């Protein structure tokens, strides 16, 4: 008989116990691992691999830009409107717009002065005032150029002493009235007035002639300068204009309706030719106001009553006194 080694039995028992313990531990680990895995976060999605995808022929769309608010469309533009042509005609005016103000050609001019003595009216030039013309032998209106404001209220302003304007009717006091045409009358008037106001030796220079039109009434003007022999004197200047209609040949024609303007100046205070022309063309005949209407006829007095219808005047009987016998 074989004798069993007691140590071998004990070793086998120990090995069996160790094997049982190892199996129990393995089962515990197998059960615990799934529980621990379920508590972890979800795994990240797999990264797509571009290498495996086929190349695309279409370009990728660009990233959207930041949106910008479009400008407000013009009122007259349409969605399909083309750019405007710089050479195109301007659009027609709005038919509902108010028309521009129309200035009447015969509108009264500002600061208009009536001259009853000469029978005309005129527009006062800017910067000029009317002066006293009572001591003048020729003309009925005298204008002076102001050089400043009046020193005190109610007093006339200071005026220049080297320039003046004379206006009046071209009557028989002036030799120029005998000239049949306005151009000859203006030249004659300029020559006579030049000798009267500038009686110094000299030479006439820079002579001019200008046509005038005063609201349909024709006229003419003459201008020249005088270079005096005395070099200390500034050149004199004179502008003369005649406007109106000369006398007609008809026996029943009225007096001639012609007026004149004489503008005197110097090189230090020259004649304003444009203002002189405007002054002459502003002359208008002074129309007398219409006569006052005749008074209405008085109501007739009532007719006297017929004689048969006159009521008798009551009379009081005179008392009679009886005398004693």
From Swiss-Prot:
Region (3 X 4 AA approximate repeats of [DA]-P-N-A): 85-107
Annotated Pfam families: FAP
Region entry Disordered, spans: 38-110, 286-325
GO MF entry, a single one: extracellular matrix binding
PTM info: Glycosylated, with mannose residues. The secreted protein has from 0 to 9 mannose residues, the majority have 6, 7, or 8 mannose residues (22, 24 and 17% respectively). Deglycosylated molecules had a significantly lower capacity to elicit a DTH reaction in guinea pigs in vivo or to activate specific T lymphocytes in vitro. Pretreating mouse macrophages with mannan decreases binding of M.tuberculosis. The non-glycosylated form stimulates IFN-gamma production however, so glycosylation is not essential.
Signal sequence extent: 1-39
Any one GO BP annotation for this protein: cellular response to starvation
Stretches with biased composition (Low complexity): 49-60, 75-87, 306-325
Keywords, in A-Z order: Glycoprotein, Repeat, Secreted, Signal
Spans of repeat Sequence: 85-88, 94-97, 104-107
GO cellular component terms given for this protein: cell surface; extracellular region
Glycosylation sites: 49, 57, 66, 316
Uses described in the biotechnology field: Major immunodominant antigen that has potential as a vaccine against tuberculosis. Can be used as a DNA vaccine in guinea pigs. Apa-ELISA could be used in diagnosis.
Localization, UniProt: Secreted; Cell surface
Stretches with biased composition (Pro residues): 61-74, 88-103, 287-305
Keyword presence, Secreted: yes
Lineage top rank: taxon: Bacteria
Protein family per UniProt: Belongs to the Apa family.
Job description of the protein: A potent antigen in animals immunized with live bacteria, it induces a strong delayed-type hypersensitivity (DTH) in immunized animals. Elicits a mostly Th1 type of T-cell response in healthy humans; induces IFN-gamma production from CD4(+) and CD8(+) cells. Functions as an adhesin, binds to mouse macrophages via mannose residues. Might interact via host CD209.
Protein name per Swiss-Prot or TrEMBL: Alanine and proline-rich secreted protein Apa
């Amino acid at each position: 008989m074989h004798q069993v080694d007691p140590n071998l039995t004990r070793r086998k028992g120990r090995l069996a116990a160790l094997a049982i313990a190892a199996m129990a531990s393995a089962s515990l680990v197998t059960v615990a691992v799934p529980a621990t895995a379920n508590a972890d976060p979800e795994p990240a999605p797999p990264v797509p691999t571009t290498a495996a995808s086929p190349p695309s022929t279409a370009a990728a769309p660009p990233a959207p830009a930041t949106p910008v608010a479009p400008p407000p469309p013009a009122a007259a533009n349409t969605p399909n409107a083309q750019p405007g042509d710089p050479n195109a005609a301007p659009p027609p005016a709005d038919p509902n717009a108010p028309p521009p103000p129309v200035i009447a050609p015969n509108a009264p001019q500002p600061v208009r002065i009536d001259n009853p003595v000469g029978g005309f009216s005129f527009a006062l030039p800017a910067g000029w005032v009317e002066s006293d013309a009572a001591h003048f032998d020729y003309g009925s209106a005298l204008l002076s150029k102001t050089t400043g404001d009046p020193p005190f209220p109610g007093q006339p302003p200071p005026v220049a002493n080297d320039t003046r304007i004379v206006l009046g009717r071209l009557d028989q006091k002036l030799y120029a009235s005998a000239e049949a045409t306005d151009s000859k009358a203006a030249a004659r008037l300029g020559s006579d007035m030049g000798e009267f106001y500038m009686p110094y030796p000299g030479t006439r220079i820079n002579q001019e002639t200008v046509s005038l039109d005063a609201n349909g009434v024709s006229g003419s003007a003459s201008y020249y300068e005088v270079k005096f022999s005395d070099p200390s004197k500034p050149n004199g200047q004179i502008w003369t204009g005649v406007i109106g209609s000369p006398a007609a040949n008809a026996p029943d024609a009225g007096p001639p309706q012609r007026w004149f303007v004489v503008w005197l100046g110097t090189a230090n205070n020259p004649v304003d030719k444009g203002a002189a022309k405007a002054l002459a063309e502003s002359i208008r005949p002074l129309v007398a106001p219409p006569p006052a209407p005749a008074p209405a006829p008085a109501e007739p007095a009532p007719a006297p009553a017929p004689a048969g219808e006159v009521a008798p005047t009551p009379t009081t009987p005179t008392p009679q006194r009886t005398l004693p016998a």
